[in-house]
Design a protein with these regions (language model features):
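Short C-terminal tail/terminal secondary-structure segment
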Residues: 121, 209, 221-234
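Alpha-helical segment proximal to the catalytic Tyr-Lys
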Residues: 101, 145-146, 218
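Short, small/polar-rich loop/turn modules that mediate ligand/substrate recognition or access, typified
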Residues: 148, 153, 220-222
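Active-site helix of classical SDR
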Residues: 96, 132, 140
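Residue(s) in the substrate-gating loop at a strand-loop-helix junction
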Residues: 116
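Substrate-binding pocket helix/loop in short-chain dehydrogenase/reductase
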Residues: 72-73, 80-85, 111, 190
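Canonical Rossmann dinucleotide-binding motif of NAD(H)/NADP(H)-dependent dehydrogenases/reductases
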Residues: 1-14
Length: 234
């Protein structure tokens, strides 16, 4: 949804994905597809190199890769922990670092990191995800402080549960770790803390990203902006 919205606004979009879904999106919007694994440093570098080779510069970076693993700390696989940090924290750092020279040279850049309400608060059984998303908020703030003098803004969007495969895939895991039926997970786990009892739609996140990349948001930087249906209002 984010790639589609930015393309609709006139951006030339580079889509990176580990599977064919990204290729389909890129083809539909007339963008460039780069296959890669964000857990690998060489693939992160190749992505930025491809964007620079095709378009000459980079104006906007959206870090949106992520996945979930539900487990207690006691049972959390160490290799899973390392992979989650690589995809959701190290990759955004590397991509920011690789895009920075082009943004600095043109004195304009927009970095939008898709964090989560779990980058601001915590829940049990999600240590890897929560640690990575908290770290991403910290990276965002540091990038904002360093980028202010050269026209680069950096912000994190922190949504509640978004209607995506990532959320769909964790229902069974949530039911298992909490000892409740799968049918109750959305109502009692995902929606219960929210003031507005629904999931966030992907298009809403895409609209927020587009706003942060617009001239109207030029003064917003270093912020962890909630789109949480009232989760953190308590």
């Amino acid at each position: 949804a984010i790639a589609e919205r930015l393309a609709a606004d006139g951006a030339q979009v580079v889509v990176a994905d580990i599977n064919d879904k990204g290729a389909e999106v890129a083809q539909a919007i007339g963008g460039l597809f780069v296959r890669g694994d964000s857990a690998k440093r060489v693939d992160c570098k190749a992505l930025v190199d491809a964007a620079l080779a095709k378009y000459g510069t980079v104006h906007i970076l959206v870090n949106n890769a992520g996945f979930q693993h539900v487990s207690t700390i006691e049972d959390f696989p160490e290799d899973m922990w390392e992979k989650m940090q690589a995809v959701m924290l190290t990759a955004p750092f590397l991509l920011t670092r690789y895009c920075w020279p082009a943004m600095k040279a043109q004195q304009w850049g927009r970095i939008v990191n898709i964090s989560s309400i779990h980058g601001l608060i915590a829940s049990p059984n999600k240590a890897g995800y929560i640690a990575a998303k908290h770290g991403l908020v910290g990276l965002t703030k540091t990038a904002a402080l360093e980028g202010g003098a050269c026209g680069i803004t950096a912000n994190a969007i922190c949504p509640a549960y978004v209607r995506t495969p990532l959320v769909d895939n964790q229902v069974a895991d949530q039911a298992r770790t909490r000892g409740i039926p799968e049918a109750e997970v959305i109502e009692k786990v995902m929606l219960e803390p929210a003031a507005i009892k629904r999931l966030i739609e992907p298009a809403e996140v895409a609209d927020f990203v587009a706003y942060l990349c617009s001239p109207a948001a030029g003064g917003i930087t270093g912020s962890a902006l909630t789109m949480d249906l009232g989760w953190t209002a308590r």
